[in-house]
Design a protein with these regions (language model features):
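C-terminal motif of bacterial Sec signal peptides marking the signal peptidase cleavage site
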Residues: 41-43
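Post-signal peptide N-terminal segment of mature Sec-exported envelope proteins
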Residues: 53-78
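Bacterial signal peptide processing site
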Residues: 45-48
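Gly/Pro-enriched, hydrophobic low-complexity segments
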Residues: 165-212
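N-terminal polybasic/positive-inside topogenic patches
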Residues: 4, 14-17, 29-33, 37-38
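Acidic/charged, solvent-exposed loop-and-adjacent secondary-structure segments enriched in E/D, K/R, S/T
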Residues: 127-152
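N-terminal mature ectodomain segment of secretory-pathway/periplasmic proteins
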Residues: 71-123, 128
Length: 212
């Protein structure tokens, strides 16, 4: 669903080395269903060419941002259930995040334990494997950008943002606003055992909501 809202045919993240495994007998079914609208990692037979430098993500149509370096300290390790909603439909998946000062890995599993995607981001760049796309959730690349936006410090993001954009912590929320002051992404946090952890991500431009 998100591919119709993003520029360049819906590629949410550039600089991506990807391998998407789809058997030929499944492709026609995918095309007939909602999955065709969400195969945003450029499809089974046409990988997105790798670009130099760190990967970029769309913030809104016409505005991209280069992601911060993958390292984070202290290290983050979590296993969370993500529930996404779009057009009144919801879907859930289990996401396992591991990040340290050198590398970030993000794996998504279905409710029955089937791996949907695996994303690795390190000094060599971004590598993603995605076999199944869940229509009611953003693609793996967009989930990665949202995860980094919610976990990485503002000091890491601010130099990367387009001119005039702001990222601000206000109480239990983090707000990303464009140069016109419009709220683009809103992240809500909860204090758990002394740690400020994200519990929801609202993307107002691309119209999706993720509950963690």
């Amino acid at each position: 669903w998100l591919s119709g809202l993003l520029p360049d045919g819906g590629v949410a993240l550039s600089g991506l080395r990807q391998h998407i495994n789809c058997r030929p007998d499944k492709r026609s079914a995918i095309r007939r269903g909602l999955l065709v609208a969400t195969l945003m990692l450029a499809g089974c037979s046409h990988p997105q060419p790798e670009q130099e430098g760190r990967p970029q993500a769309w913030l809104e149509p016409g505005a991209r941002v280069t992601l911060p370096a993958p390292g984070i300290s202290p290290a983050v390790s979590s296993q969370q259930l993500l529930t996404g909603s779009f057009n009144g439909k919801t879907q859930s998946l289990l996401v396992m995040l591991n990040a340290d000062d050198k590398k970030l890995t993000l794996a998504g599993l279905s409710s029955v334990g089937i791996r949907l995607f695996l994303v690795t981001y390190d000094e060599k760049g971004l590598h993603a494997e995605q076999s199944i796309v869940v229509p009611q959730l953003p693609p793996a690349s967009q989930v990665l950008a949202d995860v980094m936006l919610s976990h990485w410090p503002i000091s890491a993001w601010q130099p990367q943002l387009p001119k005039g954009w702001t990222l601000t912590d206000i109480g239990d929320k983090r707000e990303l606003r464009n140069a016109r002051g419009k709220l683009v992404t809103e992240i809500t946090y909860l204090n758990r055992k002394g740690k400020r952890e994200p519990i929801s991500i609202e993307q107002h431009v691309f119209k999706y909501h993720i509950t963690i």
